[in-house]
Every structure is written in C-alpha cells, then in structure tokens.
Amino acid sequence: MSLVYMNIMTAFMVSLAGLLMYRSHLMSSLLCLEGMMLSLFVLATLTILNSHFTLASMMPIILLVFGACEAALGLSLLVMVSNTYGTDYVQNLNLLQC
C-alpha cells in the first residue's frame, strides 16, 4: 500500500473516530461526515486513475453529488433544529416524538 492511500485511510478513520466521539453537537457530526465523504472521494478518484478503469470514471462525481445532497439535508436539519429548540445538542432531541 502506498503512503498516499495510507494517509487517505487515516483521514477517513480520524473522521469516523470524530463522528463516534463528538456526538454532542449536530454541527460537529456534520463536519465529520463531510471529512469522511472527502476522503472517500479522493480515494475513489486515485483508485480509478491508478487502475485506468475508465468505465468507473463517473463514480467520484456521483459520490460528490451524494455528498452535496447530504450536506444540504444536514444543514437544513441543523437550521430547523436550531430554530425549534434554540440549540444544536443532539442529546436534547428525541426522535420518537412526532
């Protein structure tokens, strides 16, 4: 495994650890998810470029589209929760309520 791939996988693992450890605020969870999507995008792009597999060249673009949709939904949820409850603490949310 090359050093570049190790760095990208380390970035993914650090983002995953941040997502698992810092779950108190919704904004920090969204930032960790974006870090994971960015490292997956770079990993997919480098893998496709190094393997010369041109049929899968649309995969990183599709991953970026899903990442943009995830960011838009996450930010709209953050705005809605902040306006409703006045804070972005995840512990204050009860998902079983209607």
From Swiss-Prot:
Which superkingdom?
Eukaryota
Principal subcellular localization? mitochondrion
- The EC designation for this entry is 7.1.1.2
Gene Ontology MF annotations: NADH dehydrogenase (ubiquinone) activity
- TM spans (from-to): 1-21, 29-49, 61-81
Q: Where in the cell is it found?
A: Mitochondrion inner membrane
From the UniProt record, list the reaction(s) this protein catalyses: a ubiquinone + NADH + 5 H(+)(in) = a ubiquinol + NAD(+) + 4 H(+)(out)
What UniProt keywords apply to this chain's record, in alphabetical order? Electron transport, Membrane, Mitochondrion, Mitochondrion inner membrane, NAD, Respiratory chain, Translocase, Transmembrane, Transmembrane helix, Transport, Ubiquinone
Tell me the Gene3D superfamilies matching this sequence: 1.10.287.3510
One Gene Ontology term, aspect cellular component: respiratory chain complex I
Q: Which residues form a coiled coil?
A: none
- Purpose: Core subunit of the mitochondrial membrane respiratory chain NADH dehydrogenase (Complex I) which catalyzes electron transfer from NADH through the respiratory chain, using ubiquinone as an electron acceptor. Part of the enzyme membrane arm which is embedded in the lipid bilayer and involved in proton translocation.
Subunit and partners: Core subunit of respiratory chain NADH dehydrogenase (Complex I) which is composed of 45 different subunits.
Q: Which family does it belong to?
A: Belongs to the complex I subunit 4L family.
This chain belongs to the protein called NADH-ubiquinone oxidoreductase chain 4L
The species is Muntiacus vuquangensis (Giant muntjac)
